């Protein structure tokens, strides 16, 4: 077996059971990985230097194909939200992965999940594709060269899109599989070329281990102002986490995954993974610039046949086009990935019904209610099985597919942290205004940015608020620079009776969804629910 690159010779591929490999390329950088990827025909070069790859059948995550080993160590798992396989089935899958790898050239990266040295997880990722190796090297945190000589992984991932699972033998649903064994700290990914499965496997692992160490893992972006005022933005894919946290007046901590621990907030990653459908220089200059340079990886972005210039408006392959780039491609990104305890928590919802206000102030009890509810609209393309229209979705903790533990674990941690650090909480609608999806229009990003700026700099505390009669939270009535009519969504609808009917229906959906949490929360949180009587009228 031929090996190249810097590595720990005493802890190589054989320690994972990989044998009879053709080659292993260790910890290669972008230039070498570009070379291997282009030579193998895995990807093409865009006009501006980004590497552009097509993921084929799978253009998003496939949560129905994700499985966790059920054994004595995982009885604390939230099995209502996770699928299980036996240790024996996983072992058969593992052995078949090892057999499939024989004779292949693999790329290995030694990386960290987590910017806080106390809580990070040492992660080794084996991939059969060079561009997947570049992707995960970009998304996680790279050790210093000197650390690679003695690197011993805690978590190992093997990612082979050419592998096909056997549902009968392996206890899975299809030929596509993501399988996690928390006891052995092994993740197996097969059948899918969608690179996002790798990063979310690391996130799921951190979601499992960190709470017992006093760290709340969060599906959120984060930034910090010049006065050290950290803000975190919860939200599902497509709700604006990446876009809204990339603010030229604030330092970006990260765009997707963070921990909130004893010393503040820290990024789990060293890169960004931005949705780039309809990406433009005018609306998102930082992300546009980062996506159009050497070292960026574009997924399913259509290139002009002659010029090779990316056409970010073209969603013919998928609406879930993506750009992965190093965090330091954003000019004002943090170099440490760490920040003080938050002053503001923002929950982003892409409301497909168009009845939530553009911003609302939440009490601590309302914050826990909306965190456990995790309301948004699933946006087309981020998962398999969705159509072209957004669907209303309650994804608890704004990240249900990535939660190995009961949602109440994360909800209680958030409530304690909000109380301990006197945090202001906000609900922001980045979805529709002036009607439902199909009738109304998307909330103008300039309005959202203006409202967020006012919330984060403290000026929103000084305006007049009204109590929303449907949801009970506080909504500003006026703010300089923002049209007053947009602050009260009913004013943006031509048909007021239809608005009332739609708002009542959404209240009912919240109530129905939250029923499963009522026994786990106290009276304050139950009282923070939208008005039950109103929904039943």
UniProtKB/Swiss-Prot annotation:
It is found in: Cytoplasm. One of its GO terms (biological process) is gluconeogenesis. Pfam families: PEPCK_ATP. One of its GO terms (molecular function) is phosphoenolpyruvate carboxykinase (ATP) activity. Binds 1 Mn(2+) ion per subunit. Keywords: ATP-binding, Cytoplasm, Decarboxylase, Gluconeogenesis, Lyase, Manganese, Metal-binding, Nucleotide-binding. This is Phosphoenolpyruvate carboxykinase (ATP). It comes from Bradyrhizobium sp. (strain BTAi1 / ATCC BAA-1182).
């Amino acid at each position: 077996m031929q090996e190249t690159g810097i590595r720990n010779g005493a802890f190589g591929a054989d320690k994972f059971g990989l044998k009879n490999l053709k080659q292993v390329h260790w910890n290669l950088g972008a230039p070498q990985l570009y070379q291997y990827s282009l030579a193998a025909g895995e990807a093409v070069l865009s006009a501006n230097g980004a590497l552009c790859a097509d993921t084929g059948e799978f253009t998003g995550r496939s949560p129905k194909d994700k499985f966790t080993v059920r054994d004595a160590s995982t009885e604390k798992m939230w099995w209502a939200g996770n699928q299980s396989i036996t240790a024996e089935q996983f072992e058969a899958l593992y052995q078949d992965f090892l057999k499939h790898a024989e004779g292949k050239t693999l790329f290995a990266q030694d990386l960290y999940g987590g910017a806080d040295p106390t809580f990070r997880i040492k992660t080794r990722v084996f991939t059969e594709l060079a561009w997947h190796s570049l992707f995960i090297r970009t998304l996680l945190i790279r050790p210093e060269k000197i650390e690679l000589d003695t690197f011993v992984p805690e978590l190992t991932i093997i990612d082979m899109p050419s592998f096909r699972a056997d549902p009968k033998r392996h206890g899975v649903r299809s030929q596509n599989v993501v399988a996690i064994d928390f006891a052995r700290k092994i993740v197996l990914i097969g059948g899918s070329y969608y690179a996002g499965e790798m990063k979310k496997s690391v996130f799921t692992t951190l979601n499992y281990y960190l709470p017992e160490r006093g760290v709340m893992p969060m599906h959120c972006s984060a930034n910090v102002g010049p006065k050290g005022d950290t803000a975190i933005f919860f939200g599902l894919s497509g709700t604006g986490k990446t876009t809204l946290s990339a603010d030229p007046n604030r330092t970006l901590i990260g765009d997707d995954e963070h921990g909130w621990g004893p010393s503040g907030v820290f990024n789990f990653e060293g890169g960004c993974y931005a949705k780039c459908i309809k990406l433009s220089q005018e609306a998102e200059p930082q992300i546009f610039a980062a996506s159009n340079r050497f070292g960026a990886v574009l997924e399913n972005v259509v290139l002009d046949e002659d010029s090779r210039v990316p056409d970010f408006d073209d969603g013919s392959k998928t609406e879930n086009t993506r750009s992965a780039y190093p965090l330091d491609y954003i000019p004002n990104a943090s170099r440490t990935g760490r920040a003080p305890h938050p002053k503001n928590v923002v929950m982003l919802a892409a409301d497909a019904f168009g009845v939530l206000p553009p911003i609302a102030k939440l009490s601590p009890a309302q914050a826990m209610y909306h965190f456990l509810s995790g309301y948004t609209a699933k946006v087309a393309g981020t998962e398999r099985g969705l159509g072209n229209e957004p669907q209303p979705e309650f994804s608890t903790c704004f990240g249900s597919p990535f939660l190995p533990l009961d949602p109440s674990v994360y909800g209680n941690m958030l409530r304690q942290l909000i109380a301990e650090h006197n945090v202001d909480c906000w609900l922001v609608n980045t979805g529709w205004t002036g009607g439902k999806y199909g009738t109304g229009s998307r909330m103008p990003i300039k309005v959202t940015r203006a409202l967020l700026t006012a919330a984060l700099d403290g000026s929103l505390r000084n305006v007049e608020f009204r109590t929303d009669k449907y949801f009970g939270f506080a909504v500003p009535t006026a703010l300089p620079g923002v049209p007053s009519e947009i602050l009260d969504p009913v004013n943006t609808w031509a048909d007021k009776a239809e608005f009332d009917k739609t708002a009542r229906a959404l209240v009912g959906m919240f109530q129905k969804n939250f029923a499963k949490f009522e026994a786990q929360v106290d009276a304050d949180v139950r009282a923070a629910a939208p008005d039950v009587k109103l929904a039943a009228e």
